[in-house]
């Protein structure tokens, strides 16, 4: 049995305010909202892909070096290696115009405030590559005047082993950084949330993979064999 609702006393003034001829069918607002979210979600996905594609293929390094590893870094800009194939041949003399910084060499304690200052002057998004054993862990300089790893005061994205590493290793680090950038999503630094604006706490790769590294270093006991 079907039931229908009819307006009572159609000649009343209420019917003039809500006449029958103005009634029309409307779509479900929930379904419409879901459709819009899927549509704009797809657009934002492609827009994010385009932004990451342009960003990873136009990485401008900051012209900054500390010691001998910088010579190997600059060698990658020669015609033999041709780093311009990866869109990273434009050296910037100002940190405000650079996309990433390469810590190539020994980070002395006296230079740590300068490196930190230059990193703070770089605009977001920005990345850091630690090049060489000295920048990674202090290298052979286990002394009071050398910082035992630049990740003590900077968030490092890519580590390049070697003393000194070859230019091919630096190019490999650029390709790894490009892969990491292609997977990033906004926001990268400052976040506008419900509780206000706050800065994203970026941890270094060394801190994030600390447990994994310790599990590899620890040797299994004899009972485990």
Swiss-Prot record:
* Protein topology in the membrane: Peripheral membrane protein
**Which SUPFAM superfamilies does the record match to this protein?**
HydA/Nqo6-like
Q: How is the cofactor bound?
A: Binds 1 [4Fe-4S] cluster.
EC assignment: the record states 7.1.1.-
Task: List localization entries.
Answer: Cell membrane
List ligand-binding residues for [4Fe-4S] cluster: 68-69, 134, 163
- Catalytic class of the enzyme: translocase
Instruction: Offer a single GO CC term for the protein.
Output: plasma membrane
**HAMAP family noted in UniProt:** NDH1_NuoB (MF_01356)
Subunit arrangement?
Answer: NDH-1 is composed of 13 different subunits. Subunits NuoB, CD, E, F, and G constitute the peripheral sector of the complex.
Q: What is this protein called?
A: NADH-quinone oxidoreductase subunit B
Q: Give the originating organism.
A: Buchnera aphidicola subsp. Cinara cedri (strain Cc)
């Amino acid at each position: 049995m079907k039931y229908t609702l009819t307006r009572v006393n159609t000649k009343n003034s209420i019917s003039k305010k809500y006449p029958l001829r103005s009634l029309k069918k409307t779509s479900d607002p929930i379904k419409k909202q879901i459709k819009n979210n899927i549509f704009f979600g797809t657009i934002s996905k492609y827009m994010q892909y385009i932004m990451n594609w342009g960003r990873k293929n136009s990485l401008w390094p900051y012209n900054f070096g500390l010691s001998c590893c910088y010579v190997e870094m600059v060698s990658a800009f020669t015609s033999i290696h041709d780093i311009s194939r990866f869109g990273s041949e434009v050296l910037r003399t100002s940190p405000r115009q650079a996309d990433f910084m390469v810590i190539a060499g020994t980070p002395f304690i006296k230079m740590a405030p300068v490196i930190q200052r230059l990193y703070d002057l770089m605009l977001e998004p920005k990345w850091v590559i630690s090049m060489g054993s000295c920048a990674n862990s202090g290298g052979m300089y286990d002394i009071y005047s050398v910082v035992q790893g630049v990740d003590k005061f900077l968030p490092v994205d890519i580590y390049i082993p070697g003393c000194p590493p070859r230019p091919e290793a630096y190019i490999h680090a650029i390709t790894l950084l490009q892969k990491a950038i292609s997977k990033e999503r906004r926001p990268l630094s400052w976040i506008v949330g419900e509780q206000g604006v706050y800065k994203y706490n970026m941890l270094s790769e060394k801190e994030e993979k600390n447990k994994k590294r310790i599990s590899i270093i620890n040797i299994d006991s004899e009972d485990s064999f």
